[in-house]
């Protein structure tokens, strides 16, 4: 009787999971609905099915609020970025960066340099979101001035930002992954090099190849017009570069994110008053609706008409709807049911490792947050890895390869939503040009199949001893 109940639970878990995926595909690809509406409808339908199958609504509601709470910092950072962009354009900070950046960086080298710069900053600060929200924003303007399509720029910046987020000992994910897996941070970082460095090198090579196509992308007339227009409409004082320098310095000192961005917004407003003669009404407009450029030069107006709190609301709505989408799947225990079934059906350490990658990816699709994945998947698989004699540094690497990295290429994932909002392009547009985000998983499966770079596999209870380099 118990076996039949387990089989019934497994079939229901599979049906709920497949149903949610089908809704996403139909909504986004065929109905062409917005991401928010698709997630909201998906959450409503799967909630109804879960309740009919015995999940209590109170549990779904509690899970929903837990999801929103976990997303809280991401929501506020997204809103803060809108305020920063509006104030930094009004202050002349971003126009100044564009002005000097266009003269100092060749279009052919821009993507390569942008990736390296973001790598350095993220390694030093340990934050990918902070890197994108400061240095990334500045590089966006430069890329537009150089005529480089935004999907390429987004890919290069994300790869650079994520590189440090995965490997910096200051990164919260680098600290959390080994803590949730039962290993130490040094072993974790060293082990991640095997899946991170190859993807990073391939990404840099891709940016050199793509960059070679843009050696003459901006005509001298267009470049001159952009520089001339910026010089006529803004006071391009080098001192206007202080706001991002202040923010970066505070991030390096590991100050809390929200106060740091508040200082950045305040600095932008003060510099707008001092250097651009902005009025309080202009500040309020830039912070609320975004900076509205009216130079009469279309390419410049397109570059600078950005930011503002209102412009972040669509991104915030996607985050909230993602919480709705994941709540019934998490509350109904879909993941635990699938993991238990996987463990019962396998006898191989290779299958266990591969299953952990698949399970964590599924859970990331459900919850949209790598923080949730770390705190749930790590403890679930830690005893399983121990039983099969698998070094737990493989578990921590798995959490980073899937959660930290793949979250950038999931349209409703927290990182993907954030990046899409900052860059103004969809996740599907830039995913191909951020290969390090998904190549880590590819290399991980190669290592699992070949037994390379997984450490020494101790004998499981039912298996003979195996050793792998």
Predicted segments with their positions:
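Hydrophobic transmembrane alpha-helices of multi-pass solute/ion transporters
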Residues: 2-80, 89-109, 231-233, 245-321, ...
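C-terminal transmembrane helix pair
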Residues: 8, 180-196, 200, 327, ...
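Generic alpha-helical transmembrane segments of integral inner-membrane proteins
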Residues: 18-22, 26, 44, 48, ...
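Alpha-helical transmembrane segments of multi-pass membrane proteins, especially transporters
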Residues: 38-46, 66, 70, 74, ...
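Membrane-embedded alpha-helical segments and adjacent helix-loop junctions characteristic
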Residues: 55-144, 296-383
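Hydrophobic transmembrane alpha-helices that form the pore/transport pathway of multi-pass ion
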Residues: 107-194, 198, 360-401
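Transmembrane-helix bundle segments that line or gate the permeation/cavity pathway
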Residues: 157, 162-170, 199-216, 447, ...
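Transmembrane alpha-helical segments and their short flanking loops
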Residues: 176-186, 210-246, 271-296, 303, ...
């Amino acid at each position: 009787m118990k076996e039949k109940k387990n089989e019934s639970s497994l079939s229901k878990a599979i049906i709920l999971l497949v149903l949610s995926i089908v809704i996403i595909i139909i909504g986004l690809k065929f109905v062409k609905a917005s991401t928010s509406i698709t997630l909201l409808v998906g959450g409503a339908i799967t909630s109804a099915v879960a309740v009919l199958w015995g999940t209590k609504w109170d549990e779904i509601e509690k899970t929903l609020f837990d999801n929103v709470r976990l997303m809280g910092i991401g929501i506020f950072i997204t809103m803060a970025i809108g305020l920063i962009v509006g104030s930094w354009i009004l202050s002349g900070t971003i126009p100044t960066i564009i002005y000097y950046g266009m003269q100092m960086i060749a279009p052919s080298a821009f993507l390569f340099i942008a990736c390296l710069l973001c790598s350095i900053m993220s390694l030093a600060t340990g934050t990918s979101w902070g890197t994108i929200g400061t240095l990334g924003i500045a590089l966006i303007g430069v890329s537009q001035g150089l005529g480089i399509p935004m999907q390429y720029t987004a890919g290069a910046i994300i790869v650079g930002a994520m590189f440090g987020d995965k490997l910096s000992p200051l990164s919260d994910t680098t600290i959390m992954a080994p803590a949730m897996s039962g290993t130490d941070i040094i072993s974790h970082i060293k082990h991640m090099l095997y899946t991170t460095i190859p993807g990073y090198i391939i990404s840099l090579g891709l940016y050199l190849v793509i960059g070679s196509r843009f050696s003459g992308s901006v005509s001298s007339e267009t470049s001159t017009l952009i520089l001339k227009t910026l010089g006529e409409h803004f006071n391009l004082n080098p001192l206007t570069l202080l706001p991002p320098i202040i923010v970066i310095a505070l991030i390096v000192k590991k100050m809390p994110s929200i106060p740091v961005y508040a200082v950045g917004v305040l600095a932008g407003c003060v510099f707008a008053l001092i250097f651009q003669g902005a009025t309080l009404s202009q500040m309020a407009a830039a912070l609320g609706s975004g900076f509205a450029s009216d130079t009469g030069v279309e390419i410049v107006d397109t570059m600078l008409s950005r930011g503002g709190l209102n412009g972040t609301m669509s991104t915030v709505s996607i985050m909230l709807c993602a919480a709705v989408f994941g709540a019934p799947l998490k509350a109904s225990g879909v993941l635990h049911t699938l993991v238990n079934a996987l463990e019962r059906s396998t006898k191989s350490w290779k299958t266990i490792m591969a299953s952990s990658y698949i399970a964590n990816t599924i859970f990331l699709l459900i919850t949209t947050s790598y923080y949730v994945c770390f705190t749930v998947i790590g403890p679930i698989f830690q005893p399983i890895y121990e039983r099969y004699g698998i070094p737990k540094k493989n578990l921590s690497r798995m959490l980073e390869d899937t959660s930290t990295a793949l979250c950038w290429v999931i349209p409703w994932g927290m990182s993907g939503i954030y990046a899409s909002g900052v860059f103004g392009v969809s996740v599907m547009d830039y995913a191909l040009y951020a290969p390090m985000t998904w190549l880590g998983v590819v290399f991980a499966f190669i290592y699992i199949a070949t037994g390379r770079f997984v450490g020494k596999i101790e004998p499981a209870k039912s298996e003979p001893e195996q050793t792998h380099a």
